[in-house]
UniProtKB/Swiss-Prot annotation:
Organism (species): Synechococcus elongatus (strain ATCC 33912 / PCC 7942 / FACHB-805) (Anacystis nidulans R2)
Cited NCBIfam families: S6
Organism lineage string: Bacteria, Bacillati, Cyanobacteriota, Cyanophyceae, Synechococcales
Official protein name in the record: Small ribosomal subunit protein bS6
GO biological process: translation
Statement: the UniProt record of this protein carries the keyword DNA-binding: no
Length: 107
């Protein structure tokens, strides 16, 4: 089966400790790998102010996961994100073109 490139961004509650945030990131990465996806990159983008209140929260912790898979991994991931009380919002996007690999710059 053909693998596609996906990007999932989710927002965690701002009142979580750093340890809880790391546990949540690891939990969703494990869920993806167990479902057969290959995690390419995970970016912990930090705490940011939200444009509007979500569940009475003014700030959220943004996390982005880039991964490849055949598409069957999305439903279990989104179900877990939807049922989690620590996640405020999430969005999964299928990328049309795989982004280029980062090039090392010599100083």
């Amino acid at each position: 089966m053909k693998d596609f490139y996906y990007e999932t961004m989710y927002i965690l509650r701002a009142d979580l400790t750093e340890e809880q945030v790391e546990q949540a990131i690891a939990k969703y990465q494990t869920l993806l790998t167990e479902a057969g996806a290959e995690v390419q990159d995970t970016q912990h983008r930090g705490k940011r102010r939200l444009a509007y209140l979500i569940n009475k929260q003014r700030e959220g912790i943004y996390v982005q996961i880039n991964y490849t898979g055949d598409g069957s991994q999305i439903a279990p991931l989104e179900r877990a994100l939807r049922l989690s009380e620590e996640v405020l919002r999430f969005l999964t996007v299928k990328q049309e073109v795989r982004p280029p690999a980062p090039v090392a710059v010599e100083a």
